Amino acid sequence: MQGDLAGLLTIGQVARRSGLSVKALRHYDRVQLLRPAAVDGGSGYRLYRSDQVEEARLVHLLRSLDLPLEQVRTAVAAWKAGDGESVSEVIRLHRRHLDARVTRLRGALHRIDHLLAEGLDAVMTDLDTTSGTAT
């Protein structure tokens, strides 16, 4: 079996070349997102082909965009199939999701600023007045 493993990269080598941590690579193996090319039967070491480094870099990039794992899985599958347009569409959809989230967060920040500026009692009184249940 040792001859079959020649030329493969260790998980540490892939981690260094891709920017992913060893822990992340193990996780992506467990969730079947980025499987090693082989696992050494004696040591249990995960081993990767050199072309898997580029795939690991793509996973790292997509996760850095806060893409959920299932969307990463979809984008990686499209990329491996040579379908760059589908990868772009996944990213565009995620951007729209993030934009909506940022809008919600800006609203929350505005309400926090109002609360801090006016004080809790004043804000609660405003809420009672606007809901028609002033005491």
Residue ranges and their predicted role:
Residues D40, D128-T129:
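A short beta-turn/loop motif at secondary-structure boundaries
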Residues V14, Y48, S86-L93, T130:
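N-terminal short leaders/motifs
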Residues T129-T135:
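Glycine-rich, often proline-containing surface loops adjacent to acidic residues and nearby aromatics
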Residues D51, D126-D128:
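Short glycine-biased active-site loop of nucleotidyltransferases that positions the nucleotide triphosphate
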Residues H60, A77-D126:
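Short, charged amphipathic alpha-helical surface segments
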Residues M1-L69:
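Basic helix-turn-helix/winged-helix DNA-binding cores
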